[in-house]
Amino acid sequence: MSKISLIVGLGNPGAEYAQTRHNAGFWFVEQLADRYNITLKKDPKFHGFSGRGQIEGHDVRLLIPTTFMNRSGQSVVPFSKFYQISPEAILIAHDELDMDPGVIRLKTGGGHGGHNGLRDIVPHIGANFHRLRIGIGHPGSKDRVSGHVLGKAPQNEQTLMEDAIHHALSNTRLLVDGQIAQAMNQINAYKPK
């Protein structure tokens, strides 16, 4: 039973990307920081914004890389190594093309699934970390993927994603307690309204 002690949100830095689908992982960590009054401060050493605080009685670090998505490993890898956090204690929240908006899934291990942020992390720390996959939907054509992930979702899809993130946040205690199987059951059972 490995307790989550590092929660990472993947996305792209800058105001122009803040509301894009690719930043769903950022949204999760930002809302988590707000919920538990954890201040995220610029951390140039690790190319990101990081914070540390108590979440449901556990000491947890939060990280939002300020590298572009395809360079996420430049932040996550040195951060986890410096603080000696094993992959089993890491949760990475990210957008997921292969799931509809409003669908959210917790998964342990696996490959990068074509996700450029994960693709940059897996070779360095392995694949045995936890992923919170936040559905953003697929545009239907491979040629339209870049514009889709870097585009802002229409309000109805945005609401579905926010509701799914809120549901995952309500299961934070299970994650930091190391009750991953129970967290998976709760989070993965979520049905969009």
UniProtKB/Swiss-Prot annotation:
SUPFAM superfamilies in alphabetical order: Peptidyl-tRNA hydrolase-like (SSF53178)
Keywords, sorted A to Z: Cytoplasm, Hydrolase, RNA-binding, tRNA-binding
Catalytic activity: an N-acyl-L-alpha-aminoacyl-tRNA + H2O = an N-acyl-L-amino acid + a tRNA + H(+)
Binding, tRNA: Y17, F68, N70, N116
Molecular-function annotations in GO: peptidyl-tRNA hydrolase activity; tRNA binding
Feature type site, description Discriminates between blocked and unblocked aminoacyl-tRNA: N12
GO cellular component, one term: cytoplasm
Catalytic residue positions: H22 (proton acceptor)
Pfam families: Pept_tRNA_hydro
EC number: 3.1.1.29
InterPro entries: Pept_tRNA_hydro (IPR001328), Pept_tRNA_hydro_CS (IPR018171), Pept_tRNA_hydro_sf (IPR036416)
Location relative to the cell: Cytoplasm
Domain of life: Bacteria
Top-level class of the enzyme under EC nomenclature: hydrolase
Site (Stabilizes the basic form of H active site to accept a proton): D95
Primary location group: cytoplasm
GO biological process entries: protein quality control for misfolded or incompletely synthesized proteins; rescue of stalled ribosome
UniProt keyword annotation of Signal present: no
Record carries keyword Thylakoid: no
Subunit (UniProt): Monomer.
Protein task: Hydrolyzes ribosome-free peptidyl-tRNAs (with 1 or more amino acids incorporated), which drop off the ribosome during protein synthesis, or as a result of ribosome stalling. Catalyzes the release of premature peptidyl moieties from peptidyl-tRNA molecules trapped in stalled 50S ribosomal subunits, and thus maintains levels of free tRNAs and 50S ribosomes.
PANTHER family associated with the record: PEPTIDYL-TRNA HYDROLASE (PTHR17224:SF1)
Family per similarity comment: Belongs to the PTH family.
NCBIfam families per the UniProt record, alphabetical: pth (TIGR00447)
Descriptive protein name: Peptidyl-tRNA hydrolase
Native organism: Acinetobacter baylyi (strain ATCC 33305 / BD413 / ADP1)
